[in-house]
Structure formats: structure tokens, C-alpha cells
Curated annotation (Swiss-Prot):
Its job: Catalyzes the deamination of dCTP to dUTP.
EC annotation from Swiss-Prot or TrEMBL: 3.5.4.13
Alphabetized PANTHER family for the sequence: DCTP DEAMINASE
Gene it is expressed from: dcd
Protein name: dCTP deaminase
Subunit structure: Homotrimer.
């Protein structure tokens, strides 16, 4: 399995729509950086957030109650305040169409990590298509700003040594084609 370089990421995005919209260079002046890097792509977080609150006493991943989260639009302010020790969901500006022979791993940006903001995203499986739901945790005892439409995490692409027999699309992945923030689902 090989780590893919900027030239491959650029070609796959411009010729095959792997990342859209695609920024061919790293943008980083007066913003948290985003765009193409040497061996990855820095994704941006949109302006819509879902802040988890304590209206209900329990989070159940098998039976998630949407009332456990409050939708917040940060488009006007340009940022979202994540309360101390809080958790929120968001989504990428970029839409992904993963090749069948490629898996992507997403890692939080050091700018946020150094402020106690932890970003988690599960792997982008072969032939996954959709916007990416981003999990954001504030591990500090202080409120923190998360900037809308700026960098939030870096995606690295790993191409398999051989083609997988069954992709995410082939098995009807439950988050295939997701748009916006997608809450937990269980196939029934």
C-alpha cells in the first residue's frame, strides 16, 4: 500500500472528481491552511455545526435521538464557539469520490490539536462518495473557536497493492452519498 503524492491527488481530483471543489495549492495566509500539500490534502470545515447538549441523559449510537444536538449556523460570524469539554459534528466543504483501489485516512491539524481541539474522522473507504462528517472535541476547560470555511484536518491517500473485492459502494454503505452533517445510523 503506497502513500500518494500531490501530483496523483491533483490528477485524480481534476480528471476524475475525487475532491470537489479542489484547491491546487496550499492556502494559509491569515487562515487555518487548506488545499493540496506534499502527500495529502487539507480539508475545510463548513459553516454548519451540530453541538451535542445534555437535554437527554444518554447518547445511544444504535438509537440516536436528534434532540441530543442543536444545529448552529456559523456562516454570519465566520466561526463557531465550541464550549469547554464539548463535542460537535460538522461537515466538509469538499465532496469526495474515492477510487476503488484507494483508502483515505484523516488526521487533525496541529493548529487545532495544540489548542486542545481534537478532530476525528473515520477512514474514507474505497468508492465512498459524499461529504465528510467531522467529529470535533474540545478537551480543554475553556471555550474554543472553530473557524468555518477554513482548514480542519488533513487527508492522506493510500492506494492498495491490489483491487478490493468489495467496496463501500458495492456493499451499500450506510453513509454513501451523504450530504451535510449525517447523524449516526444503524442498518435495520
Amino acid at each position: 500500500m503506497g502513500l500518494k503524492a500531490d501530483s496523483w491527488i491533483k490528477k485524480m481530483s481534476l480528471e476524475h472528481g475525487m475532491i470537489s471543489p479542489f484547491c491546487e495549492k496550499q492556502v494559509g495566509k491569515n487562515v487555518i491552511s487548506y488545499g493540496l500539500s506534499s502527500y495529502g490534502y487539507d480539508i475545510r470545515v463548513g459553516s454548519e455545526f451540530m453541538l451535542f447538549d445534555n437535554k437527554n441523559a444518554l447518547i445511544d449510537p444504535k438509537n440516536f435521538d436528534p434532540n441530543n444536538a442543536t444545529k448552529i449556523d456559523a456562516s454570519k460570524e465566520g466561526f463557531f464557539i465550541l464550549p469547554a469539554n464539548a463535542f460537535a459534528l460538522a461537515h466538509t466543504i469538499e465532496y469526495f469520490k474515492m477510487p476503488k483501489d484507494t483508502l483515505a485516512i484523516c488526521l487533525g491539524k496541529s493548529t487545532y490539536a495544540r489548542c486542545g481541539i481534537i478532530v476525528n474522522v473515520t477512514p474514507f473507504e474505497p468508492e465512498f462518495e459524499g461529504y465528510i462528517t467531522i467529529e470535533i472535541s474540545n478537551t480543554t476547560n475553556l471555550p474554543a473557536k472553530v473557524y468555518a470555511n477554513e482548514g480542519i484536518a488533513q487527508v492522506v491517500f493510500l492506494q492498495g497493492d491490489e483491487m478490493c473485492e468489495q467496496s463501500y459502494k458495492d456493499r451499500g454503505g450506510k453513509y454513501q452519498g451523504q450530504v451535510g452533517i449525517t447523524l449516526p445510523k444503524i442498518l435495520k
